Amino acid sequence: MFSLKMRASSNGNHVSGAERLVKEEQIEEISSELIKRAMNHENGVPDFINLKVEKVTENINYIEHLKIKTINSNSKETSREFAINILKKELENYFLKNGKDTKKIDELIDSAFKIIDAGNMRGAAILDLDGNRLEKSSDRGIRVRNIDTAEELSKKILKDGSLTERTVDAIAIATKVVNCDIIAELCTSDNFSYTTGYVATKDGYFRILNLKDSGQVGGRVFFAESSDIDELYDKLENMPVIVY
């Protein structure tokens, strides 16, 4: 298997990114698809595209995908209430386990929304239970690498008319992170017109419509219990995972 990583930017600002794990005979075809994806992105034509092809020498981990649950909402305010409630339910268990004041959960979640609404990070922010930023670079963040969605699962997702290629990409990321010591993930798309976001926990991938306004930037935040940031980075970046 080979890892394909595509990153595209314009004037130093992130435009598009994607990860694939493919067989050797698929490299040319998938590389072309990734470049086309970068060149046709709604956020603009990039002036820089990086495509990295690297042989995977570690064993591939196959992980069953999180169950996809769609929450319909017509307003950002209502959608965010749904997201907050899902996050609070999950975070409360970890706050109690670590003897922390559960009244601080609202403040922690509010910090996460401020991060995603600010946008322009190339990767995800990581917050511990005290609200500290753990990522090594606050501009770059951390990228979840060496992932893909199994072809059968991709086809199944795309058969559902309400789901998209973005869902295929997101389910791989969400499934990997909650299996790598991340408590929960909050995400909105960096595509300006795509307003659906999600919350991921061990209970599922909660796809929430209208989690941001059209034209608004997006972002990604991981909530982590562990302070061993080097181990966390190693798992998220280097552990090869195919989600089925």
From Swiss-Prot:
InterPro entries per UniProt: BioW (IPR005499)
Cystine crosslinks: none
Recorded metabolic or biological pathway in which this protein acts: Metabolic intermediate metabolism; pimeloyl-CoA biosynthesis; pimeloyl-CoA from pimelate: step 1/1
Name of one Pfam family that matches: BioW
Keywords annotated in UniProt: ATP-binding, Biotin biosynthesis, Ligase, Magnesium, Nucleotide-binding
MF-aspect GO terms: 6-carboxyhexanoate-CoA ligase activity; ATP binding; magnesium ion binding
Entry EC number(s): 6.2.1.14
Record's keyword annotation contains Magnesium: yes
Catalytic activity reported: heptanedioate + ATP + CoA = 6-carboxyhexanoyl-CoA + AMP + diphosphate
Obligatory cofactor(s): Mg(2+)
A biological-process GO annotation: biotin biosynthetic process
Signal peptide range in chain numbering: none
Quaternary organization: Homodimer.
Entry-linked HAMAP family: BioW (MF_00668)
Entry's family note: Belongs to the BioW family.
Name of the protein: 6-carboxyhexanoate--CoA ligase
Biological source species: Methanococcus maripaludis (strain DSM 14266 / JCM 13030 / NBRC 101832 / S2 / LL)
Gene transcribed to yield this protein: bioW
